[in-house]
């Protein structure tokens, strides 16, 4: 079981910022997402491989973007698809849908899902690509949950259905040398001032699997049929055992796995790994954004430890550490994310802690 320490109260639906919405109208952003074949193929394969689930059904696409998921659903036989987006990209989606001959099946609506008036009372399926960096940065999950509670039939299906989140410590002296130690001597000059922010802000990078110095720990599962808004801020316990000796622990990385299950009764173990799901012959579709698989546009969230303040200790294989991981939302930016970690090696007396911003 994944142990929960506490879940701070968080019940209001976050509102997207205008800069965030303007970014979503740019073609290059959508090109990047569509060319992420791990992401797009997973949605396509689940929908096309389960046409019987979509045939004759009413589908709601929350945050439809270019309309690609709505088009998949219509082509799979959905009788009606309602595509909703709060940015100007909806005009492009409407044109894409018309050009592909699905205007009679897909209805496009611009506005917040909480404010638009749908032409139906209930839907059979909600499909959405809402995930952000570290899963919840600039994510639309608040709105998807609202749509589920308002529009999804009791027997309805969420696509995707489950998210498993992972954390593990990393040791990457090459990255530290290139991006942190570099500034200490630039052609003989001290430019440490340029390091500002690199250990304060989470980085979005695709890390080599070789940088992992422990087995990943599954710290959170979201079951989209049941998750509530207050579940999106949390503190979780985690632990790890070093699988190799290291000169210093340089940080942590966070990623998520997505699961698409054909029935709301289907369960996904909290420690299920997406990269092993299909190989094990499990039903549904799964993909990972982790470092041991093909890169996705989400990459991983990298939290570098500020080892300048205190010289880190070398560690031996087999040493164990544990701590807490916290996600919170800053009051002044509802789309931002603050990640806080605490950690302590069993051999140490002192616990360490650090926070990182994603904004």
What positions do the PLM features span?
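Class I SAM-binding transferase module
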Residues: 2-62, 66-326, 330-359
């Amino acid at each position: 079981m994944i142990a929960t320490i506490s879940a701070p109260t968080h019940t209001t639906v976050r509102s997207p910022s205008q800069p965030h919405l303007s970014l979503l109208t740019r073609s290059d952003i959508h090109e990047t997402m569509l060319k992420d074949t791990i992401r797009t193929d997973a949605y396509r394969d689940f929908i096309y491989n389960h046409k019987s689930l979509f045939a004759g059904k009413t589908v709601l696409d929350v945050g439809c973007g270019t309309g690609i998921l709505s088009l998949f659903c219509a082509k799979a036989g959905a009788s009606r698809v309602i595509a909703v987006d709060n940015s100007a990209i909806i005009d492009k989606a409407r044109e894409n849908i018309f050009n592909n001959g699905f205007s009679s099946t897909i209805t496009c609506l611009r506005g917040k899902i909480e404010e638009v008036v749908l032409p139906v009372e209930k839907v059979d399926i909600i499909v959405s690509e809402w995930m952000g960096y570290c899963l919840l940065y600039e994510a639309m999950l608040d709105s998807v949950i609202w749509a589920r509670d308002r529009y999804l039939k009791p027997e309805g299906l969420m696509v995707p259905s489950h998210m498993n989140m992972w954390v593990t410590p990393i040791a990457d002296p090459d990255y530290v040398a290139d991006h942190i130690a570099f500034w200490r001597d630039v052609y003989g000059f001290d430019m440490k001032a340029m390091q500002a922010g690199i250990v304060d802000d989470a980085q979005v990078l695709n890390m080599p699997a070789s940088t992992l110095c422990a087995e990943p720990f599954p710290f959170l599962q979201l079951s989209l049929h049941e998750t509530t808004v207050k579940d999106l801020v949390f503190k979780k316990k985690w632990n790890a055992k070093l699988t190799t000796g290291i000169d210093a622990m340089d940080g942590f990385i966070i990623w998520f796995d997505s699961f698409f299950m054909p029935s709301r009764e289907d369960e996904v173990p909290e420690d299920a790994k997406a990269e092993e799901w299909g190989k094990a012959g499990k039903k549904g579709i799964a993909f990972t954004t982790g470092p041991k698989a093909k890169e996705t546009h989400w990459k991983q969230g990298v939290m570098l430890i500020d080892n300048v303040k205190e010289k880190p200790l070398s560690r031996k294989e087999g040493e164990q550490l544990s701590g807490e991981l916290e996600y919170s939302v800053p009051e002044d930016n509802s789309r931002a994310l603050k990640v806080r970690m605490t950690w302590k090696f069993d051999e140490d007396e002192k616990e360490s802690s650090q926070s990182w911003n994603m904004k």
